Amino acid sequence: MKEIKGVIFDMDGLIFDTEAIYYQAQQQAADQYNIPFDKALYREYIGIADEEAWESLHQRFAEHGKDTVQKFIDDSWGEAHRIFHSGEVDLKPGVRELLQFLEEQEIPRVVASSNVRPVIEILLEHAGIRDKFQAIVSAEDVKLAKPNPEIFNIARAHLGTSAEQTLVLEDAQHGVQAAIGAGIPVIMVPDMIQPAEELAQQTAAVLPSLHEVIDYIQN
């Protein structure tokens, strides 16, 4: 059994299958406003803070007009949040089993997500797992988004653990880079993008799902 005293979870694409929802909402809005958007382009924005992504979209699609690009952003954001509020968001494989295992081992858990707190709270409550986490660190709590390590440093402070005794679980490149920057071991469970070899070598492991995290901790 590894000496892990606390686990930090990303949320989008790791706990919940939200990336697919974000993509579908954006593609639907892009088609409506004749904006050339596809899954390859969406992948470029995975793990990037909302404000940074919106600014980039305005620059990329400036020729379509500021108002049109803003409608594209607002409509896609609104549709995604409608789905979130409805509770129609699937948990990723292994989430419940891993949370139960960590609870049994008395290993505390924190969510550290670039999403906003209301969305995090809604999704966790709908899934019935809000009480499985001792704290939440959200976009409102940091000045600098991932890949800056600030969010994980704050999360670790909630746990009261050393970096060596903490484990970060991430699905996206920016999150992995943030954990590495914080000096915290990180397991990547890729969602829509596989890691580059150089990045993968800097992780504690790259695993297909959260089911395998239990085996990692036990061995």
Regions picked out by a protein language model, each given a short descriptive name:
Residues 29-30, 49-64, 123, 155-156:
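Helix-loop "lid/cap" segments that line or gate small-molecule binding pockets
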Residues 36, 58-97, 105:
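Metal-dependent phosphoesterase signature
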Residues 1-5, 100-103, 116-219:
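Asp-based, Mg2+/Mn2+-dependent phosphohydrolase catalytic module
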Residues 28-33, 97-107:
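A short, Lys/Arg-enriched amphipathic alpha-helix followed by its capping loop at the start of a domain
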Residues 22-25, 46-50, 72-76, 80, ...:
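Hydrophobic/aromatic residues within well-ordered alpha-helical segments
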Residues 32-35, 61-65, 105, 128-132, ...:
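Short helix-capping segments at alpha-helix termini
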